[in-house]
Amino acid sequence: MKVGVLALQGSVSEHRLSMERLNVDVVDVREPSDMNGLKGLIMPGGESTTLRKLLVNSGLWDTISGSDIPIMATCAGAILMGKSDETTFEKMDYRIDRNYYGRQKDSFEKNIRIGNNQKFRGIFIRAPAIVSVGDGTEAIAWDGEMVVGCTMDRHMALTFHPELNDDLIFHQMWIEGL
């Protein structure tokens, strides 16, 4: 199986390493032709406005918009997957609030709840929050009552950075769904 990591900004190398640790072939995606033959695409965090511009300029916006490739999106990537006041892919049925947790200086780490009350150390960097989920969207991670991770079809959106944690549970869950 081969997946791609959108290599325009964000924690590209960390996501690559997570996939390699799971013995998954991984390639960097910088232009539309890089998506040929992929079973899935990881869309890392970064800054969502910049990411959107880079996607448009590279031709990847239209390619991803017209594709049904499963996507794992983190932080800014999650902003582009849901519904927002900004232009997004709207591939998942949830509303997201950009910079919900505040500015860069307000970034933090804390235990979040996943699945059957299992704990995961979430790393939130200028993080958004999923403020509502629609039909067909399943919440999979929570900060208190706030949804910070969800799935829909074969897509996964996380408002934190699982790639900065040694626990590969979210990468593993996504790969198992491909």
Q: What function would you assign to each model-found segment?
A:
Residues 85-146:
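Pocket-forming structural segment of enzyme catalytic cores
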Residues 10, 129-178:
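C-terminal and late-domain segments of enzyme folds
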Residues 42-43, 73, 158:
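Redox-cofactor binding/interface segments in oxidoreductases and associated redox assembly factors
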